Amino acid sequence: MTAQTLYDKLWNSHVVREEGDGTVLLYIDRHLVHEVTSPQAFEGLKMAGRKLWRIDSVVSTADHNTPTGDWDKGIQDPISKLQVDTLDQNIKEFGALAYFPFMDKGQGIVHVMGPEQGATLPGMTVVCGDSHTSTHGAFGALAHGIGTSEVEHTMATQCITAKKSKSMLIAVDGKLKAGVTAKDVALYIIGQIGTAGGTGYAVEFGGEAIRSLSMEGRMTLCNMAIEAGARSGMVAVDQTTIDYVKGKPFAPEGEAWDKAVEYWRTLVSDEGAVFDKEYRFNAEDIEPQVTWGTSPEMVLNIGGKVPNPAEETDPVKRSGIERALEYMGLKAGTPLNEIPVDIVFIGSCTNSRIEDLREAAAIAKGHKKAGNVQRVLIVPGSGLVKEQAEKEGLDKIFIEAGFEWREPGCSMCLAMNADRLAPRQRCASTSNRNFEGRQGNGGRTHLVSPAMAAAAAVTGHFTDIRTMA
């Protein structure tokens, strides 16, 4: 039998029918639903007189539009409130395996809530009307975002039409240095292969450095796969995966658990499996990362300097650097560790899990917010993350440092709720995109790890966390 990649195994086990032109009908195991991309899909079902094909495949929450402060005042923005209320109504009418509404203890960012509830399991196909659905590939699952029409298609048929991507292996060999996190690994890889480097590929992350990551770290890495242009990102199943899933609310139990684990252990690429493309990186080369421009690929080690467009020979790239520097208000040659910040945001589906908050708290402990830093928002990814952080006293560390301890939600990752940047405000952010206007009109975003964000909060500028030990 031909050796198969993990992607081959996941894909082949879910093909319902081949259409003959490379297109297949692909079965979907888990459908994650939030308030932004579902209203039109539910409306389409109503107009056609259809029901959900499999109610027990749907797990839903509100996240993009929900405020992370002043919950006693409810949702103030009328459009945001309409979307959240509409989700409430649709779930009541159509049903779901689980629904975590606004202000429910289980509510949170869909890509944090799903895994912590055990709604994401190894071997599954997982879709959501959200580009960062690739997060769930950390479990040895095939996960990717879909458009609103595909959301309706999945609701009505439990299938989507799709074409198989090419396969890519990105291996990081060796051990990561102290202070280097999964976020740094993700940004480093994107800096090396570019935001189009993974276009057309399903990426498997491997190597010693990847296997050493926790599930939280693997989720961060797979979350960022889309920023390298990939359709999906994934990590093979191992004991770390199985230990994380065990005991979760929607995980199998008893004999079903034993059978599931037996199957899950097969979800690795076979020895001798051939990938369409491979990259290998040395963990020793990876330092804490900071983006300087308006694309995740515009990234450097913390010891670097803002690039000089005059040194770029490619006219298209040179123009891109010039535009980015103008938007970001930066001068060529400026050391990254001399760039001051106005706002710090620690949260998002990339970095709002308990491990992320622990890393940030370890840096913040015993320090105060720098005088030039206007606000530091700490936004846990879910009500359960918030509860755990408070049990550990992390909230007190943040509050004593002068940070804001918020309620769960997508928050300042995107300008879709009350948390947003003002024009020209510079933000150290643990989110996943630094596009122009992503966090607010005219806002300037620098992507970093939670520890690096906390360091910027207490020093007032980007700082190598390894100097703070």
From Swiss-Prot:
Cofactor note: Binds 1 [4Fe-4S] cluster per subunit.
InterPro entries in the cross-refs: 3-IsopropMal_deHydase_lsu, Acnase/IPM_dHydase_lsu_aba_1/3, Acoase/IPM_deHydtase_lsu_aba, Aconitase_4Fe-4S_BS, Aconitase_4Fe-4S_dom, IPM_dehydratase_rel_enz, IPMI_cat
Keywords of this entry: 4Fe-4S, Amino-acid biosynthesis, Branched-chain amino acid biosynthesis, Iron, Iron-sulfur, Leucine biosynthesis, Lyase, Metal-binding
Catalysed reactions listed for this entry: (2R,3S)-3-isopropylmalate = (2S)-2-isopropylmalate
Gene3D superfamilies: Aconitase, domain 3 (3.30.499.10)
Enzyme Commission number: 4.2.1.33
Pfam family for this entry, one: Aconitase
Necessary cofactors: [4Fe-4S] cluster
Pathway(s): Amino-acid biosynthesis; L-leucine biosynthesis; L-leucine from 3-methyl-2-oxobutanoate: step 2/4
Tree of life domain: Bacteria
CDD domains: IPMI
GO BP, sorted A to Z: L-leucine biosynthetic process
Amino acids binding [4Fe-4S] cluster: C349, C410, C413
Signal peptide (UniProt feature, chain positions): none
Single GO MF descriptor: 3-isopropylmalate dehydratase activity
Protein family membership: Belongs to the aconitase/IPM isomerase family. LeuC type 1 subfamily.
Subunit structure: Heterodimer of LeuC and LeuD.
Summary of the function given for this chain in its UniProt record: Catalyzes the isomerization between 2-isopropylmalate and 3-isopropylmalate, via the formation of 2-isopropylmaleate.
Protein name as catalogued: 3-isopropylmalate dehydratase large subunit
Source species of the chain: Neisseria gonorrhoeae (strain NCCP11945)
Gene: leuC
